[in-house]
Amino acid sequence: IDPADVEKLLELMREQQFGKLVAHAPYTMNLCAAKEDIRKFSKEMIADDLRRMDYTPGNYYNFHPGSHVGQGADAGIEWIAEALNEVLTPEQTTTVLLETMAGKGSEVGRSFEELRAIIDRVELSDKLGICLDTCHVWDAGYDIAGDLDGVLEKFDHVIGLNRLCAVHFNDSMNDRGSHKDRHACIGEGKIGLDAMRRVATHPLL
């Protein structure tokens, strides 16, 4: 990375009053894979990405927690926390975001409780936040169309709204609780335009 390019970007962000950047990890990364070599590669990838992120201090790095591939969610949670304990550093300025997942296949992070369990096992948990994907939580079974207040209240009780740093704003092609993770254009899916509007304008978001 050319430091001169970084400085131009930072200057542009200041001039145009950018909000925080949200970088997204590669989808191939899986911190809780059954195979050790995949876990090792994933840890190296996130560590390298976090080093690069510090060129633009104070932003977000979002990733899918991973798929346990038959080991069970509890084992997956342990692997993810162990990896984060290895790669997070006290000096980093980037907040790492765990993304809410739809629960497709053996995905970890299909419930607020699973995400909380990861956070509780990470020593530098002050470096962690959450990215709430509207399609994913809908497909996971949370009724953001009919009871957005209730979903946010549950999120606050289990994780804490202080950790909610970003929202992936997507409609869903699927019925609530389908665990399929198929996004739709905003207003053209099962969540619907009115519900998406309520998400966009909710005072807690």
Tell me what each language-model feature is.
Residues 2-7, 39, 43-46, 77-82, ...:
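Charged helix-capping and loop-helix junction motifs
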Residues 2-22, 47-57, 85-92, 119-127, ...:
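Acidic (Asp/Glu)-rich catalytic clusters
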Residues 19-26, 30-33:
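Metal-cofactor-binding active-site regions of metalloenzymes
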Residues 21-25, 61-63, 96-98, 128-133, ...:
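Hydrophobic faces of well-ordered beta-strands that scaffold small-molecule active sites
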Residues 26-28, 66-68, 99-105, 135-140, ...:
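Active-site beta-loop-alpha junctions enriched in small/polar residues
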Residues 28, 46-49, 130-132, 137-138, ...:
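Long, contiguous hydrophobic alpha-helical segments, chiefly transmembrane helices and signal peptides
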Residues 31-129:
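Active-site acidic/histidine proton-transfer and metal-coordination neighborhood
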Residues 108-116, 138-205:
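Gly/Pro-rich active-site loop or hairpin
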